[in-house]
């Protein structure tokens, strides 16, 4: 009986996330729930952008190539595609805007920071969404991005912050009241 009671109490907090066909749809749905928990400034020298090696996530079927991105403070992005080295450039314009491309003025796009913490990084391409082919750049810390696919990584991001929204103070107050009542009627 005690197990059933605990299962019923825990059930509302064990929410299964819906399946999405594309990474873009999933990010559109999950981003509003986690946006407030991330860092907000790309200009900070201690920002995760510069401290973490990022793996680019994709929802292309059959894609197995690991693309590891390292953002250097000098404006260079060193990219390893399964060990083969490549490079790009970036320039931080404001706290939440960055240009990323082959060079700052060639094959480059303006992105806006949507979410950044020590494990996940999401940029959204600036402009009219109807004209944009790839709306988001989604990166994960190397330890996450090399072992999970895009939908599992997004679930991990949501789970990380879902627990932070849980009203622990409320639970502690209720628990204290229950213990107090039990001691009183003992």
Regions picked out by a protein language model, each given a short descriptive name:
Residues 94-98:
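Short, conserved beta-turn/loop elements at beta-strand boundaries and strand-helix junctions
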Residues 1-72, 78-80, 84-85, 100-186:
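Lipid interaction determinants
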